[in-house]
Amino acid sequence: MNAGPLTASTTADIDANVSEVFCSVQGEGPYVGVRQAFVRFTGCNLRCSYCDTPVGKEESCRFEEIPGSGVFSQPDNPLSVTDIARMVSSYGKIHSVSLTGGEPLMHAGFISGLELASPLYLESNMTLPQMAKRIKDKVSYVAGDVKLLPPSAVDDMDLHLENTIECFRTLKATRDRDCFCKVVVTKDTAADDVEGMIGAIAGYISCAVLQPVSQKELLPEPGYLLGLQERMLDHVNTRIIPQTHKMWGCL
Ligand SMILES: C[S@@+](CC[C@H](N)C(=O)[O-])C[C@H]1O[C@@H](n2cnc3c(N)ncnc32)[C@H](O)[C@@H]1O
Ligand SMILES: Nc1nc2[nH]cc(C(=O)O)c2c(=O)[nH]1
Ligand code: SF4
Ligand SMILES: [Mg+2]
């Protein structure tokens, strides 16, 4: 049994460093447009070259009390599970609570202690299988990224791929949980790599989403995305959905 530092302990953590809490609509993937509270944790175990999310401050969180106002209070970190429950319940009729980051699975101990009135929607890089095991019965939605990293970005590529597959196996779609995958596609994304990984996880997901990268200079040609979609359709229901929240300037 693996007993490394990222092996989950069995007790819940009562606090965590959170970079922001806000209310918006889900801007990515098949649930685009549903109203959500977003809880963005600090810290990440990866450094994706295209990442659009700055590393959050550890000292304080920013909390948008009125949705869309652009006005933030700055509660001190760490925040408790009770603080989070109070903040997200203030947002009214939400569909779910998006747990994002950074990498939320680095805070699995805290997530396992959350008791919220709304279902949990996990947004993860799917590379920490021990943490995934710990929270698998807490989350109702899993938006799992497939990270096709260049060899220079990982010490052990086989282990990275195994960890990804193990996360999807653990958090797979069931009667009580939806699980789908997103792949951020850039002009450097190799179709063979995408197809290999999607083939390996197809049995665990309800659909796959090809998400064009937001930086214009990194975008592939439209024909490339359509060709990739056609290949993926051999394995799983596949949609091309760009990030929508950036179109209308919401968080
Ligand atoms: C900021 S990440 C946080 C959650 C987790 N670490 C992950 O990567 O899934 C949230 C989502 O934004 C996507 N994303 C980040 N930068 C992007 C970009 N430049 N263009 C399109 N999607 C991007 C990620 O791939 C992921 O699906
Ligand atoms: N509106 C909106 N939708 C999102 N879906 C995933 C996001 C993320 O950064 O995890 C995100 C985000 O930051 N904003
Ligand atoms: S895993 Fe997610 S948060 Fe971390 S660097 Fe990649 S896109 Fe950004
Ligand atoms: Mg985002």
What would you call each of these model-derived segments?
Residues 29-36:
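Ferredoxin-like iron-sulfur electron-transfer modules
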Residues 30, 49-52, 155, 222:
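Short aromatic-enriched loop/helix-cap "lid" or pocket-rim segments at secondary-structure transitions
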Residues 24-28:
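Short, solvent-exposed loop/turn elements at beta->coil junctions and helix N-caps
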